[in-house]
Regions:
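The feature captures the beta-strand-to-loop junction immediately N-terminal to the Walker
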Residues: 64-66
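Helix-to-loop junction immediately C-terminal to a conserved catalytic motif
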Residues: 79
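Conserved catalytic motifs of ABC-family nucleotide-binding domains
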Residues: 189
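Conserved ABC ATPase signature
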Residues: 168-172, 176
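Conserved ABC ATPase "signature" region
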Residues: 95, 146-163, 272-273
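Conserved ABC transporter NBD signature motif
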Residues: 87-95, 107
Length: 284
């Protein structure tokens, strides 16, 4: 049986300890049944193999790799959207591999997710006001008045005007929609955000703005973050540490500057030698 997760007061004290990971994966594997094969001899896809990772308080872990390398599946295990086939998942040092509904609710209030495409992450029929207030209502936080105040605070945090409150997602630009998605992720005062390709669906001119916003929020709020991208130069821009994934495995992990200036794995060198990001036309 999994250990009880910490109470809210315990969570706050543990998060203040820079040596206690918010989320930790130990030897995690995720296997899916493939559509090929037969009923009696099904084929399996090993999406994640033996992954070890930590989300540390106030730090940004970048996960980089090509499409299909397992980075998004790994992130889904971290936030509870995917169950690990093997291995262990820890939340504040407690084993939550077999998560109950209470586990998921509690972790969801501490770790939020920003998805790749804000157009699909937001309800097209809900105004920005309702999108941002909804998590507070679901978790029964505050009164209508305090929720309205929090919604306005969130707009300010992500640089949107109050005039956006009554807008529907379809009336906003891609960059504005992603700002709303980020604001929604911040609504419950999380201590960590998992950002899964948060700039890849945006125009090049908007990507730097969103990256700068995430970087500013990390500093202002003391957020931990997992930043996922196929572009190693974009990951470099925001990360303290970087994990490079290939074929479901972490092939290299380390301090961002050290890993990028002195890569030890051929796959990392391949990523660095690929076409440079438009955000960084020249490598150091």
């Amino acid at each position: 049986m999994s250990e009880a997760i910490p109470a809210e007061t315990d969570v706050q004290s543990l998060i203040s300890d820079p040596d206690t990971p918010i989320i930790e994966l130990k030897n995690v594997e995720v296997t899916f049944k493939a559509r090929t094969g037969s009923l009696f001899r099904p084929n399996h896809v090993h999406a994640v193999q033996g992954v070890n990772m930590k989300i540390m308080p106030g730090k940004v872990l970048g996960i980089v790799g090509e499409s299909g390398c397992g980075k998004s599946t790994t992130a889904n295990v971290m936030c509870g959207l995917q169950v690990a086939t093997k291995g262990k998942v820890f939340f504040m040092g407690k084993d939550v591999t077999k998560r109950s509904a209470a586990h998921r609710r509690h972790i969801g209030s501490v770790v939020s997710v920003v998805f790749q495409d804000p157009a699909t992450a937001l309800n097209p029929r809900m105004t920005v006001q309702d999108q941002l207030a909804d998590p507070l209502r679901v978790h029964k936080i505050g009164t209508e008045g305090t929720r309205d105040k929090r919604v306005r605070e969130l707009l300010g945090l992500v640089g949107l005007p109050l005039s956006a409150l009554n807008a529907l997602p379809g009336q906003l630009s891609g960059g504005q929609r992603q700002r709303v998605a980020i604001a929604r992720a911040l609504s419950l005062h999380p201590k960590a955000i998992i950002a899964d390709e948060p700039t890849s669906a945006l125009d090049v001119s908007v990507r730097a703005q969103i990256l700068n916003l995430l970087s500013d929020l990390k500093k202002e709020l003391g957020l931990a973050m997992v930043f996922i991208s196929h572009d190693i130069q974009t990951v470099r821009y925001i990360s303290d540490r970087i994990a490079v994934m290939n074929a479901g495995k972490v092939v290299e992990e380390g301090d961002a500057d050290t890993l990028l200036n002195h890569p030890s794995d051929p796959y990392t060198r391949k990523l660095l030698g690929a076409a440079p990001s438009l955000l960084h036309p020249q490598l150091d």
